[in-house]
């Protein structure tokens, strides 16, 4: 196993522990708590994949961080912070909408890269909107936290979420996954639109009908993919 992979996991475990202590003091806002919860799932998945104990890794990560901080000057820290571009966290969904449990009458699931696409194919003839919480850097989608499909009545009928065991995805991965979800929902004569925020930062454009600029050929392909593979 690569040593950098192990040490990276150890540092991530310790930094998560620090963030958890911060949250335990009721100091974290909603985006902070949301990332904390999802990063916990990711660490568990990575720990299982690597065969490493999280508690032991956290202790090792603490030693690594302490060594770095001991060698770090205040001036170097200021320069590092100034050189790192800041990302923004954007929310279409409330914390309640993100954490709400939902159930499917006809569950369908597809894994696309490091993203998991789930939908209820029993849903027909509904108006559906896709909402997402995600981070943005340089005015482009950086990391998808969670995307969910809602009916006008507020019911959740679909979802795209990162797989904890396979961290890392691009904005193209997200756009492809959205295309798959739209194709599957439209197969049952649902009308699907995407939130303006997601359109703006994933596609850098928006349409009046709420549709991302997916070519007709791609949309037909997405629908066939959902029907045959999901």
From Swiss-Prot:
Q: Which domain of life is it from?
A: Viruses
Annotated stretches, region: CPSF4-binding: 180-215
Per the record, which residues fall in region PABPN1-binding? 223-230
One Pfam family linked to the record: Flu_NS1
Give the UniProt keywords, A-Z.
Eukaryotic host gene expression shutoff by virus, Host cytoplasm, Host gene expression shutoff by virus, Host mRNA suppression by virus, Host nucleus, Host-virus interaction, Inhibition of host innate immune response by virus, Inhibition of host interferon signaling pathway by virus, Inhibition of host PKR by virus, Inhibition of host pre-mRNA processing by virus, Inhibition of host RIG-I by virus, Inhibition of host RLR pathway by virus, Interferon antiviral system evasion, RNA-binding, Ubl conjugation, Viral immunoevasion
> According to the UniProt record, where is the region RNA-binding and homodimerization?
1-73
In chain numbering, motif Nuclear localization signal lies across: 34-38
| GO molecular function terms listed in the Swiss-Prot or TrEMBL record | protein serine/threonine kinase inhibitor activity; RNA binding
Is-annotated flag, keyword Oxidoreductase? no
* InterPro entries xref list: NS1, NS1A, NS1A_effect_dom-like_sf, uS15_NS1_RNA-bd_sf
The compartments listed are: Host nucleus; Host cytoplasm
Assembly description: Homodimer. Interacts with host TRIM25 (via coiled coil); this interaction specifically inhibits TRIM25 multimerization and TRIM25-mediated RIGI CARD ubiquitination. Interacts with human EIF2AK2/PKR, CPSF4, IVNS1ABP and PABPN1.
Question: What role does this protein play?
Answer: Inhibits post-transcriptional processing of cellular pre-mRNA, by binding and inhibiting two cellular proteins that are required for the 3'-end processing of cellular pre-mRNAs: the 30 kDa cleavage and polyadenylation specificity factor/CPSF4 and the poly(A)-binding protein 2/PABPN1. In turn, unprocessed 3' end pre-mRNAs accumulate in the host nucleus and are no longer exported to the cytoplasm. Cellular protein synthesis is thereby shut off very early after virus infection.
In the record, the note on similarity to other proteins reads: Belongs to the influenza A viruses NS1 family.
This chain's protein is named Non-structural protein 1
């Amino acid at each position: 196993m690569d040593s950098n992979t192990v040490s990276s996991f150890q540092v991530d475990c310790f930094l998560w522990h620090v963030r958890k202590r911060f949250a335990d003091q009721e100091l974290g806002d909603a985006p902070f708590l949301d990332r904390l919860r999802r990063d916990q799932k990711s660490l568990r998945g990575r720990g299982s994949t690597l065969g490493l104990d999280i508690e032991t890794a956290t202790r090792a990560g603490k030693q690594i961080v302490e060594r770095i901080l001991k060698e770090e000057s205040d001036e170097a820290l200021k320069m590092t912070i100034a050189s790192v571009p800041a990302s923004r966290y954007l929310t279409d969904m409330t914390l309640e909408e993100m954490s709400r449990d939902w159930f499917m009458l006809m569950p369908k699931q597809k894994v696309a890269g490091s993203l998991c696409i789930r939908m209820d194919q029993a849903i027909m003839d509904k108006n559906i909107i896709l909402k997402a919480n995600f981070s943005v850097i340089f005015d482009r989608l950086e990391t998808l936290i969670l995307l969910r499909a809602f009916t006008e009545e507020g019911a959740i009928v679909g979802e795209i979420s990162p797989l904890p065991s396979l961290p890392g995805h691009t904005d193209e991965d997200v756009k492809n996954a959205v295309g798959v979800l739209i194709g599957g929902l439209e197969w049952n004569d649902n009308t699907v639109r995407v939130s303006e925020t997601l359109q703006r930062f994933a596609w850098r454009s928006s349409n009046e009908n709420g549709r991302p600029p997916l070519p007709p050929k791609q949309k037909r392909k997405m629908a066939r993919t959902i029907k045959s593979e999901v």
